[in-house]
Amino acid sequence: MLHDLRIRIRFTLTVSAIFLSSLSAVAQTVEKGPVRTVLALGRVSSVVDTPMSLKLSRVSIPGGTSAVYRGAHSLVYVVSGAVTITVANDLRSVGPKQGAYLPTATDVTIHASEGAAAELLQYQLLRSADASKPAMNPPASVTELHQMKIPADSLKPGPHEFSMTTVMIPAGASRPRPHTRSGAALYYVLADGTITIWPSANIDTLSGESRSESRRIGDIQEEPYGFIHSWSPKADVPLVLLQANISQEGVPEIIFVK
């Protein structure tokens, strides 16, 4: 009887070890895939009435001061410092590596915390005719980084989602499947990596030669509909991207090549 009990215990321990090993393998597999974190999301009722652009700017607000924004749909990402964003009666604190959506045609007050300037990245979705207008009023100082004219075939009739997301691909992870956007996106590189591009491919066929190019911190990448590509990290550090995306409401942001 004691012998049988020992066999059962040994069997139970073996099965448990196999089960835990399987869970570990699954966890490692999951960890190797891209990790997407949505930081901010807004809704745009129409984007086909006039040519549209995505504009990216770096904004600095001195500590203890406030800037008022009233303009196009906007997304802000806090690089350093901290801010308090007030829209009507809604007040929200936003710290480093966090983001917020700023609605259009509304006074938005952005107050930088005492002691240090707040450094922001600001995406604006605006009419191309308004792209030269300043991103934010004094005392904020603004440096325009990039303007992307959104191709007409990237936008459809009806409401669209305007979102900001960080994408992290773990160090040494394999390259995700080639894909394109269903709308358009503008990326800012937060940690180095590589992009592979298929210039001759389309959403039905991965054809033609590919080329790989390094992207460093601060680099900017346009991703319109039909741009077939994939990102990959370095072997020893993760790839981190900040993405502003515009896509039709109810439609997946990403289209994988068949």
Where are these regions (language model features)?
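Bacterial N-terminal signal peptides that target proteins for export
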Residues: 2-13
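Short acidic-glycine-tyrosine-enriched beta hairpin
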Residues: 88-105, 201-226
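N-terminal, post-signal-peptide region of Sec/Tat-exported proteins
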Residues: 48-92
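Glycine- and acidic-residue-biased ligand/ion/polar-headgroup-sensing regions
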Residues: 71-89, 182-205
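Sec/Tat signal peptide C-region and signal peptidase I cleavage site
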Residues: 23-27
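Bacterial N-terminal signal peptides
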Residues: 12-22
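Histidine-centered metal-chelating micro-motifs
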Residues: 65-68, 100, 104-111, 174-176, ...
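Double-stranded beta-helix
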Residues: 29-37, 52-55, 109-161, 232-258
